[in-house]
Design a protein with these regions (language model features):
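N-terminal lobe of the biotin/lipoate ligase/transferase fold
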Residues: 2-156, 224
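Generic recognition of long tandem-repeat/solenoid scaffolds
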Residues: 63, 173-175
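Glycine-rich, flexible loop/turn motifs
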Residues: 117, 170, 212
Length: 246
């Protein structure tokens, strides 16, 4: 797989320690993790470049601000994370052809994000754009059955945010007749056996949207914690897929 941001056990543990205490010394972090202080400094520098604010003080490191982005080390799933791609669907297809399954591909922005019927899906920063590779034991003709558990998970979470949403059979999610999310499914296989399916999802969260669409931010009048939204959605998607398909 080319490029992208992959999971980092070091960053995962480093953030865990920084969240435990107000100040953590470089020596303490290095000893706990079995790495050098230089390695600690390098990871701190990388995290700062990714949107976290970690200050260095005479007593040690202090986590001032979270990035609130769904980086791989913030989630309990296998995730490939990209700042910008042409389409997460294309990367998902590459991974599927390599034999991957149950893997999420997330992008902050897409240059060629696509929706149903070849339509363009505008993918500006602030939204949630991802593809999921799955290999359910169903026939190719039944692949559309994957839409319902995904759309159900989205509607369920929106309801918890106080947003009443309606899902249509093609997977689009509407709020007050304005589109908030969409689902695209592409698959490979034989008539009686699905080799793999790629579920593409776009959710307008904090990103700017045209007047005919809407977003969580527009509906609620405030910015949403994108990491928390993603974390809960992925858990719900996993639950709904396991319950209805696998």
């Amino acid at each position: 797989m080319r490029g992208g941001i992959r999971d980092s056990p070091v960053k995962r543990e480093l953030l865990k320690q920084l969240r435990r205490k107000d100040v953590v010394s470089g020596d303490e972090i290095a000893q706990r993790m079995g790495i050098s202080r230089v390695a600690v400094w390098k990871h701190i520098k990388e995290l700062n470049m990714l949107g976290y604010e970690i200050f260095s003080t005479p007593k040690g490191y202090v986590l001032i601000r979270e990035a609130y982005k769904p980086y791989p080390w913030e989630l309990d799933f296998e995730v490939y994370y990209f700042k910008e791609v042409w389409s997460t669907m294309d990367i998902a297809k590459e991974l599927a052809e390599e034999g991957k399954e149950n893997v999420f591909i997330i992008a902050e922005k897409q240059k060629g994000g696509r929706g149903r019927l070849g339509r363009n899906w505008i993918s500006q920063e602030g939204g949630l754009y991802f593809s999921l590779v799955v290999r359910p034991k169903i026939s190719l003709k039944d692949v559309d059955k994957l839409v319902f558990p995904i759309s159900s998970a989205i509607v369920e979470i929106l309801d918890e945010y106080g947003i009443s949403a309606e899902m249509v059979s093609n997977g689009d999610i509407f709020v007050r007749n304005k589109k908030l999310a969409g689902i695209l499914i592409e698959a490979e296989g034989e008539i009686d056996l699905l080799e793999y399916a790629i579920i593409g999802v776009g959710v307008n969260v904090n990103n700017p949207v045209p007047e005919e669409a809407t977003s969580l931010k527009r509906e609620l009048g405030k910015e949403i914690n994108l990491l928390e939204f993603t974390r809960v959605l992925f858990l719900r998607i996993n639950h709904h897929l396991l319950k209805t398909i696998f």
